[in-house]
Each structure stands twice: as C-alpha cells, then as structure tokens.
C-alpha cells in the first residue's frame, strides 16, 4: 500500500477525522467561512489560486497566478501581484472585480482593521501600510524584515528582523509605541492565536510560543489527545 503525505488536509481539533481535500502539493492556504482559498499546483502551469468548500467539493480556479491568499476579509482577497508586477490588489472571493489599489513593489500583504500592511521591497523590506482604498504609504517598522504578523485587534505587530545585526522577533505595541525583543536569532512562521504567538526556528527543528499576557516564552511540544 502506498502512502502519500502531500496535499491539503483538514483535521478536527482533537486530532481525529483526518481527511485530504486536495492531493497535489500546495503552499499557502487560508480558511474563510466554509471555504478554503489555497495555492493549487499543476505540473505544467505551476501554482494557481483556487477555492474549495471545506469538504473538498466545488473546487474552483480563481486566478492563474501564484497568489498567496494570506489576507481574506469582508468577502475580499487582498494580495500582491506575482508574475508581472507586485502591486497590491483587491478581488472578490469569487475571483471577480480584481483591481489595483496601490502601485508598488510589495509582498506579504495583511489586511488589519482599516489598513493594509505589506513589506516594501523597494524600501529594504520595511513594514509599511496604506488605507483600504490605497493612498500614500506610511512606514511602520524601519528595519529589514523577513516576516511579520498582527494581533486580531490590530494593536500589536510581531516581526522578524533580518538585517544581520540584531536579528530576532520583536513585539511592537502601536498604542504605546514601545518595541521589545522577545527572541534573538532567526525564526519563521509567526502565527497568533488569542494571547499566544507561535513561531519556529529557521532550521525548522524547534517550535516556540510566547504568551502576550505573561511574557513567558517556551518550547512548544504539543501532545494530541483523542477521545
């Protein structure tokens, strides 16, 4: 019997009911409502943006481009162009009404509140933001960043500095203007759930979590409990 571990999977929170929605390789995926928006891989065409229901049905091509669906909000996908340009776009979750809202050399787009955040590749990967309708960009973090994420309330940004001098994950509280390093070194995959920030070392060997309320920073070694 052959065993395949590639594809897009779903699983219940207690570790049961593992099922595969899509069998070929994929990268970025985003759950929004009862649909998953994900990068669908084709051996000839490469990565394209698709959507599917959470049961794997109604698989639909949205865009023939390797768009990363990091930010889906209010029935709108916000993304940066990939193939021919790197402008910031907005598009209905149906794939219709695609329009450019900011011209620039942008990546890692996240919509938070009334702003769209992005890394400005023309500005040494500084973190910038614009309004939902575009306009002038405002610089938020003046360091070269590798990745970042924002709390649900939009008040705190966690980011990885990648300038070769003071690399690490930092916490920027926008309400107070304070910056604090929470981990020194090189890390990836910053995810935020409630008061917890999860991240992984650059080699992918160790995962960590940081408690925003208490300031505790610990190794993350979960065990899966089954009914």
Question: Where does each model-flagged region fall?
Answer:
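Short loop/turn segments that connect beta-strands within the blades of beta-propeller domains
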Residues: 4-5, 25, 32, 45, ...
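Residue position within the beta-strands of beta-propeller blades
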Residues: 1-3, 37-39, 78-80, 117-119, ...
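Short loop/turn segments that connect beta-strands within beta-propeller blades
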Residues: 12-16, 53-57, 92-96, 131-135, ...
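Structural motif
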Residues: 3-10, 44-51, 84-90, 123-129, ...
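Solenoidal tandem-repeat scaffolds enriched in leucines and small polar residues
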Residues: 71, 77-82, 86, 102, ...
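Repeated scaffold domains used in trafficking and secretory/extracellular systems
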Residues: 23-33, 64-74, 104-113, 144-154, ...
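Blade-level signature of beta-propeller repeat domains, shared across WD40, Kelch, NHL, RCC1
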Residues: 198-227
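Beta-propeller fold detector
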Residues: 19-23, 60-64, 99-103, 138-142, ...
